[in-house]
Amino acid sequence: MTPGGRLPPELLELIAERFKALAEPARLQILDILREGERTVADLAAQTGLGPANVSKHLRMLYLMGFVTRRKAGPNIYYRLADEGVFQLCAIVCERLRDAIRRQQEAVEGILPPQI
């Protein structure tokens, strides 16, 4: 923290990089599948409907950002979650979305006439 209690720019940059890695729905889908246990690229491709090359690209980013780990077993590489904390963040976002939708509904109901 800076003297004024603000986050330093270097830390903000690192945080932004992690958020960018999570800003892709396919990556969130992959992480969600990995909650159930480790998977290979082929497993993830079958479960997501994405091509293996595309899954590998997403896994590389998730690995570089520390969201997944990997282990080699024979010819296969198995990926698993490195940090379940990402789902706490997802839960916070979902709660905020519910609140925003509720407020929008209340605003619309406040301006619409009663049913005829």
Regions found by a protein language model. Give the residues of each.
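Amphipathic alpha-helical dimerization/coiled-coil segments
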Residues: 1-14, 86-116
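N-terminal helix-turn-helix DNA-binding core of bacterial DNA-binding proteins
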Residues: 10-54, 76-85
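Hydrophobic alpha-helical membrane-insertion segments
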Residues: 32-36, 67, 92
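Alpha-helical residues within the helix-turn-helix
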Residues: 46, 57, 63-64
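Beta-hairpin "wing" of winged helix-turn-helix
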Residues: 63-73, 80
